[in-house]
Amino acid sequence: MALTRPSVRASARTLYFAYGSNMDVAAMAARCPGAAFVGTARVDGHAFRVNRNHHATILPAAGKVVHGVLWTITDADQALLDEYEGVAISLYRRHEVQAQHPDGRVEAAMTYMARNTEPTLTGGPYFDALLAAARRVGLPSDYVLELETWRSEGGWGGRNSGTLGR
């Protein structure tokens, strides 16, 4: 009878930084049933942007800050997120960031960055949900106001040549 070793990764969890629609607790519960909410966090040296596909992304930007939330996710959740974010079709890619908790602790976290970073203004249900989630989780009010600068009159379209972040 052969003995098998239990997998060390069986209970492994990944720290995930969400800055867009995945900040929403109900949405994450539906997308990733094993996800556990950790709390709010910030990532320095990155800026928020809405790309030409009308999706949120972040990109490296000296002196900028992105606020969001941290989750712990299982390997199965990460596979679901990879599918949701379009990793296989190159819409997004995984990226490691240094996330700072409100108490000052900094931890490495996985996030997703869109491959298309050409900016645009946006609107509609996706962006409304993103803003609502940002408010519900308690992101700083001045940051939420900055997020709102990505909204276009009437919903989709327009251009914003800058990047957001303090």
Predicted regions and their residues:
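Glycine-aromatic micro-motifs
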Residues: A2-R166
